[in-house]
Regions:
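Active-site-adjacent alpha-helix of alpha/beta-hydrolase-fold enzymes
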Residues: 28-68
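Extracytoplasmic and endomembrane cell-envelope/extracellular-matrix remodeling and assembly machinery
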Residues: 60-61, 76-77, 85-89
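Post-His helix in hydrolase/transferase enzymes
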Residues: 70-81
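Beta-strand-rich domain onsets/edges
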Residues: 81-102
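Preference for solvent-exposed, low-hydrophobicity sequence contexts
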Residues: 107-112, 126-333
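Beta-strand signatures of extracellular beta-sandwich domains
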Residues: 121-125
């Protein structure tokens, strides 16, 4: 809104914009043709009243959706595509052959500053279904040389579809953030690998224990019977009603040994949990260097699809941190 209506060159900016989509944000019309998309669920930190409306815009509400889900959902994409092109989006369910290759690329960024992780190295390792590296060397090792805002570019790297990969962010001082994602089914040029002081400082405070932050850009719900997400670590449900109420809008869940105890209590960590979109709880995962066990992370989405599993080594947390990214879209059961 500021860019189109309040900035020094607002009139010039409006003249260059044919149409604009406002995703569950403020309610003032920016002065260009606008699609205003609203979350159907309101009453949380991101919206003050459910009857939101932007005068003069095409207003659309996504039923039973929360804030971030509204930005990433299929329903929102369909409405945006129609608004921008005048045509209905056709769903392409074709998948690339397992024998073909895909391209992977993106940025390595410090969160939330969005600056490139200059000096870090991105290593890409193929994994077995059990989460173990299958090669002696990474298929790619790329130094990050651009530390500017929006920098940190890496790739493209030739890879295989349906193959699991680990993206290792190796810091100059020797610490590593191990990033795990679900297998890619097509080329992706917008993979964000995130470094963060919170991740480095809070997931590895105590030796001989491991921790992880699990991220999905669709809120995790735990207090809505019949439409809850299941988020499991070694079979333990961590997305409980008290830790994942829908109004908390949990996108990032820190399962960490913040108390320094060899037990899992799911006690809420106060500092991280006070932040929007974040939850953190006491979870003890035994760890060693080198890893000696496999940890099972699983997700069953509230909106359908099969139970998903990512098996990951029990990296020792003082020098290794783990990030797990779940797709915001659902995988069919068949």
């Amino acid at each position: 809104y500021h860019y189109l209506a309040e900035s020094e060159k607002a009139a010039e900016h409006r003249a260059s914009v044919a149409a604009y989509a406002n995703l569950d944000g403020q309610e003032k019309n920016p002065g260009v043709p606008t699609l205003a998309v609203w979350a159907g669920r309101c009453g949380d930190a991101t919206c003050s009243k459910p009857e939101r409306n932007m005068p003069g815009a095409e207003n659309v509400t996504i039923p039973n959706a929360t804030h971030v889900q509204t930005s990433t959902s299929l329903e929102t994409f369909q409405r945006m595509f129609k608004f921008f092109t005048g045509k209905r989006a056709k769903r392409d369910i074709r998948r690339v052959s397992k024998k073909s290759t895909i391209q992977l690329a993106g940025k390595a960024l410090e969160f939330p500053q969005n600056t490139g992780l200059i000096g870090d190295k991105v290593e890409i390792w193929p994994l077995s279904s059990g989460g173990v590296r299958t090669t002696l060397k990474p298929i790619a090792s790329i130094s990050i040389t651009d530390g500017s805002e929006g920098g940190g570019a890496w790739g493209p790297v030739t890879a295989k579809p349906y193959q699991r990969y680990e993206f290792a962010l190796v810091e100059p001082e020797g610490k590593t953030i191990h990033v795990y994602m679900e297998p890619f089914v097509r080329s992706d040029y917008d993979i964000r690998l995130l470094g963060s002081a919170a991740i480095s400082n809070d997931t590895g405070k105590f030796p001989k224990s491991s921790g992880a932050v699990t991220i999905r850009y669709k809120e995790l719900w735990g207090n809505e019977p019949g439409q809850n997400d299941e988020l499991l670590i070694n079979g333990l449900e961590i997305c409980t009603a008290s830790l994942c109420p829908w109004s908390k809008e949990v996108n990032a869940y820190f399962a960490i040994n913040w108390e320094g105890k060899e037990e899992t209590t799911l006690k809420e960590e106060p500092a991280l949990s006070s932040l929007p979109f974040i939850q953190a709880a006491q979870v003890f995962i035994r760890a060693s260097e080198p890893p000696s066990e496999i940890v099972s992370y699983q997700l069953k989405s509230r909106t359908g699809g099969a139970l998903r599993t990512l098996n990951i080594p029990n990296w020792e947390g003082t020098k290794n941190q783990t990030e797990i990214f779940w797709n915001d879209f659902d995988t069919p059961n068949s």
